[in-house]
Amino acid sequence: LMKRYSRTVAQQCRYYEVNNIFEYMVETYQNGNITTFGELYRELCKEARKDFIDFLLSEVEPIYWREILKMTV
């Protein structure tokens, strides 16, 4: 498979056939697929990465923040 980089939210939603790529990413992490989560995050463009952090802090339970944030750096 070709590596995917610098993808927008819309591109990722289409590619993975999901309505909300950020929800999909969080669910992937919560299901224990940590490596897959990291790959999904790295595929996002810079602006989408910022939007993901906003989503994380506003829509995801705080108990998950620390571990998910560690995976983004």
Predicted regions located by residue number:
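Short amphipathic alpha-helical interaction elements located at domain edges
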Residues: 1-73
